Amino acid sequence: GTGAPTQGANGSTDVKIMVGGVEKVIYLPAKLADQLGYFKDQGLNVQILTEPAGATAENSLIAGDVHGVVGFYDHTIDLQTKGKCITSVVQMADVPGEVEVVATSKADAIKSPADFKGKKLGFTSPGSSTDFLTQYLATKNGVATSEYTGVKAGAGTTFISALDNNGIDAGMTTDPTVAQLLDTKKAKILLDMRTVQGTQAALGGLYPASSLYMDCAFVEQHKDVVQKLANAFVKTLGYVNTHSAQEIAAQMPKDFAGGNMDLYVKSINDSKGMFNTDGKMKADGAKNVLEVLSQFSPNVKGKKDNIDLSKTYTTEFVTKVQ
């Protein structure tokens, strides 16, 4: 695994964090914390790497290439079934921030997940959280996973072109892709999981998603580093909560706007309500994630009672944030 974080030249600590798609608004706090200088304030030199597929990001953590991942909490439960102890140390959102969009041309044929039968449904990659959630939505609405075709569609331009070229009829994605699709009228919203209300309607409860998760052994051995990361992330959540989408967009790298600042601001505005302010996991949210996964995830199915949820997240660090 990754050894101890190394000491930088100026006495700062080098930390590598992999983000499951750094330009996604659902993971905005990672790059924003960096841009605001909050990591440096904590004496951390954080290198932010990006890997658009969450399933691949978790592999780099297990392989020890990075110290932490900014990704979906559900991976911690999934990985526990494979004998890995991974824990969320900062829980940034109580909802997924995902949207199920349907191609405008197919909107009359797909009015709810019950209409998924025989359709091509996009997600980022197999084994990703969007794959999990798509399976759940189908199953919950009477469509077996064998009755639709799952398509690896990525995010951003790859997702949009899949929709354009009839590669998918509907799919799950996040802002800024959602804002782009609505702006060009290429897609309509079927289910909106950017809000608590929309998430409860779609998933029957909260579904805590965006988090900073790390290897349990690393967390035990480097509590000081984890505390500093928690300090920076929670401070960033506070910033998101107290600043406008315009102010937030202005702090981000220019290329994140993809040449359309107004649309980027809109995408932040449409999604920023998903973030909590304290980085704390809600226990009933964690329980609902397990509930959802245990219904169809091949890894979790039948093992629900063996999962120790207390090992999948901790509030130890966020409660001590100054």
Predicted feature descriptions by range:
Residues 24, 51-55, 124, 128-129, ...:
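Soluble non-cytosolic domains of exported or imported proteins
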Residues 158-253:
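Pocket-lining segment of extracytoplasmic ligand-binding domains
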Residues 219-300:
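Secondary-structure end/capping motifs
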